[in-house]
Amino acid sequence: IYCECGWNAEHPGGRRFNSREDVRTQLEATLRRMVADSTPPDVITFAGNGEPTMHPDFEAVIGDTIALRDALCPAAKVSVLSNATQIHRDSVRRALLRVDNNILKLDSAFDATVRRMNNPQSASYTVRGIVEAMKRFDGRMILQTMFLRGECGGQPVDNTTEEEVSAWLR
């Protein structure tokens, strides 16, 4: 509903990711340029058009990023904005525990609302499953939510009701 990139038109298997090496090379060049220009980043953030934790080499990409950050701009933080759908994977969990800001999204306590708002691709997606996986971080995460009212595909969507907010807070 609210992603500036729109709905994901691709389906599993149709995704394309930059290679680990390309990410490292481009990040290194960018960080070197920023440091040379005396404008080092405050934060290196993984987010955007797709889910970063779905990258097949996500753990290694995070390792490379932390190494480059430590070498070139040690004051910068590393952040990941995630829809939390991959946090059940051990490699993703390990990587997210290494970043400074592990930001995981959960927009409702109700599966039906999440399906309308976020259109998760997995038929097995459940809020309960996501919450259980979040508990494994032992508080080492930031919970991100967007409360909104609107319409999607002719269907009302509202996670600002008393019922929604009360359930989310539990």
Predicted features, each with a name:
Residues T30-T39:
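Phosphate/pyrophosphate-binding loops at sites that engage ATP/ADP/AMP, CoA/4′-phosphopantetheine
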Residues D22-Q26, Y125-T126:
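Glycine-rich anion/phosphate-binding loops
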Residues G48:
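A cytosolic small-molecule/anion-sensing beta-strand core signal
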Residues I44:
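Phosphate/adenylate-binding glycine loop and adjacent helical scaffold
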Residues Q26-T30, W168:
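Short, well-ordered amphipathic alpha-helical segments that serve as non-catalytic structural scaffolds
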Residues M54-L169:
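Conserved AdoMet/S-adenosylmethionine-binding subsite of the radical SAM
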Residues I1-D22:
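Canonical Radical SAM [4Fe-4S] cluster-binding loop centered on the CxxxCxxC motif
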